[in-house]
Amino acid sequence: MSNKTIGLGSIEIANDKPFVLFGGMNVLESRDLAMKIAETYAETTQKLGIPYVFKASFDKANRSSVNSYRGPGMEEGLKIFEEIKSTFNLPLITDVHEIHQCAPVAEVVDIIQLPAFLARQTDLVVAMAKTGAIINVKKPQFLAPHEMRHIITKFNEAGNDEIILCERGSSFGYNNLVVDMLGMDEMKQTGYPVIFDATHALQRPGGRADSAGGRRAQATELARSGMALGLAGLFIEAHPDPDNAKCDGPCALPLHQLEAYLTQMKAVDDLVKSFDAIDTSK
């Protein structure tokens, strides 16, 4: 098996390269907050020498309640993304939910994300593929790791081979997710880069009746475990005031802890990738 390397400017995304951080906030709450969070991530990752891609959503289209905050929408969201990109010279990742969003979003961001709940929607997959952008595929909570090959094939047949696979937990009964560490290793066997969404994997879906709950107190332990697999990247969301975040606050890392958190993740990644491979199948 060979590891595929995806190039994003000077950044190399691959399972055998130093990890790349996809990080930011869950949903754009305001222009000022987005700029503050982007600046904190940019300064921290530059200090630690971690390749970095800024992440936020312009629309959370799958909230538990119709009354929940969704975001500023695509038009306003893309304006904020353009300002972040030009101000901090950062590559960007965001998610799309509808076919008509793919082309305009691809003009601004560098990586388009396929949401887990929509990962089998063929028309959306084809529209995303045709943009030529790098694609981050969230593994659905209801799919086995080996089933990701079918989604890869759809993108390939639509003309796109720039694919990243993202683990975000698997359904475990009602209102609970667990992370299958061997499943992430199984996805690595495809050769495509695998990243670990360590904050969404902390969710308790529907755990607060009209929104998702979470287990923020275990954010470090879960991320350390994932990084021990030797992955292409880590996906996290942070907020300066998680208890008052407009979406997924129970899973968000407190922003003031970002440097300490990433220092540990980089140490684990550096250590694991310094080891020689051991083939225990023989």
Swiss-Prot record:
Give me the Gene Ontology terms describing cellular component. cytoplasm
| Recorded metabolic or biological pathway in which this protein acts | Carbohydrate biosynthesis; 3-deoxy-D-manno-octulosonate biosynthesis; 3-deoxy-D-manno-octulosonate from D-ribulose 5-phosphate: step 2/3; Bacterial outer membrane biogenesis; lipopolysaccharide biosynthesis
Q: Which Pfam family is one of this chain's hits?
A: DAHP_synth_1
List the molecular function annotations (GO) for this entry. 3-deoxy-8-phosphooctulonate synthase activity
Source species, domain of life: Bacteria
Query: Where does the record place it?
Result: Cytoplasm
Q: Does the keyword Hydrolase apply?
A: no
- Keywords noted in UniProt: Cytoplasm, Lipopolysaccharide biosynthesis, Transferase
Q: Does this UniProt record's set of keywords contain Transcription regulation? A: no
Q: Which InterPro entries does UniProt cross-reference here?
A: Aldolase_TIM (IPR013785), DAHP1/KDSA (IPR006218), KDO8P_synthase (IPR006269)
Q: Which GO terms describe its biological process?
A: keto-3-deoxy-D-manno-octulosonic acid biosynthetic process
Q: What's the chief localization of this chain?
A: cytoplasm
> Signal peptide span per the entry?
none
Q: What class of enzyme is it?
A: transferase
What SUPFAM superfamilies would the database entry show? Aldolase
The reactions it catalyses are: D-arabinose 5-phosphate + phosphoenolpyruvate + H2O = 3-deoxy-alpha-D-manno-2-octulosonate-8-phosphate + phosphate
The EC number(s) given in the record are 2.5.1.55
Write out the similarity annotation: Belongs to the KdsA family.
UniProt-listed PANTHER family: PHOSPHO-2-DEHYDRO-3-DEOXYHEPTONATE ALDOLASE
**NCBIfam families membership:** KDO8P_synth (TIGR01362), PRK05198.1 (NF003543), PRK12457.1 (NF009109)
- What name does the UniProt record give this protein? 2-dehydro-3-deoxyphosphooctonate aldolase
Give the species.
Shewanella woodyi (strain ATCC 51908 / MS32)
